[in-house]
């Protein structure tokens, strides 16, 4: 059966079958998967303890689930599944650092992460591990990080709210799985808190930029046309 948490990605889905954890990769995701596999990206990330292990298996295991099926992966079953709204401050911070460390390592090999959702991280004991192989895609020169706002909403902003105001974001997370938008967080912070470089650069500036973009009627096509050098990206 399909895992209820993997419904968003058109490139692949997670399934549970006969005690196995399987990942179906469809037409839309097979090129990026093959590029990362052939560049040995997955194996290096697994060896560093960043990424959950994987192995290709017979597509006949999932015969008939979708005509676009191209590859089937099997993953080890994690002993425990948790969610960001259940994590402690240190757990959320550790998951955020894993995400950044993995992303920097991928960029060094000309790959990147297509998103930055906290739900792509699980824990083995106290160690965070990345679980979404299909969000690892080839880096395109000049590309902006599509997951920047998502990283802020699901990692940085909840941590800032926790650190600056002493308010745990767990209940907020349960009500909005996308996390805390910069536009909302700015309303909760005082002027002294907004004056810190981290908050000014990653909350206030993002909030202003987003509001300006909405008011100007900017669309996704306009934003993706902008270019950013790799050193600036990093």
Locate the predicted segments by residue.
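ATP-binding glycine-rich phosphate-binding loop
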Residues: 1-18, 57
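ATP-binding glycine-rich loop module of kinase domains
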Residues: 11-35, 85
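N-terminal auxiliary segments of SAM/dcSAM-dependent transferases
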Residues: 24, 148-234
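Conserved kinase catalytic-core helix
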Residues: 36-49, 88-114, 158
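Polybasic, positively charged surfaces/segments
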Residues: 48, 81-98, 164-171, 175-185
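Conserved structural core of kinase catalytic domains
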Residues: 52-98
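Short, glycine/charge-rich beta-strand/loop segments that flank catalytic centers
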Residues: 55-62, 112-124, 173-174
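Catalytic activation segment of kinase domains across protein kinase-like and atypical kinase folds
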Residues: 112-166
């Amino acid at each position: 059966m399909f895992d209820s948490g993997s419904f968003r990605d058109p490139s692949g889905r997670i399934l549970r079958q006969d005690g196995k954890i399987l990942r179906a990769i469809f037409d839309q995701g097979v090129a990026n998967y093959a590029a990362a596999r052939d560049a040995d990206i997955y194996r290096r990330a697994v060896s560093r303890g960043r990424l959950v292990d994987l192995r290709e298996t017979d597509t006949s295991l999932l015969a008939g689930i979708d005509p676009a099926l191209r590859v089937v992966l099997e993953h080890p079953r994690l002993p425990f599944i948790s969610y960001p709204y259940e994590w402690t401050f240190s757990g959320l911070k550790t998951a955020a650092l894993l995400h950044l460390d993995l992303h920097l390592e991928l960029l060094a090999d000309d790959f990147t992460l297509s998103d930055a959702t906290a739900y792509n991280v699980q824990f083995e004991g106290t160690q965070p591990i990345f679980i979404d192989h299909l969000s690892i895609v080839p880096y395109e020169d000049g590309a902006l990080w599509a997951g920047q706002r998502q990283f802020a909403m699901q990692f940085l902003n909840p941590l800032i709210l926790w650190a600056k105001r002493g308010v745990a974001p767990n209940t907020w997370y349960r009500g909005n799985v996308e996390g805390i938008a910069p536009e909302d967080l700015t309303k909760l912070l005082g002027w002294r808190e907004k004056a810190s470089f981290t908050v000014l650069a990653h909350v206030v500036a993002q909030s202003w930029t987003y509001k300006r973009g909405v008011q100007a009627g900017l669309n996704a096509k306009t934003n993706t046309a902008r270019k950013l050098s790799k050193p600036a990206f990093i």
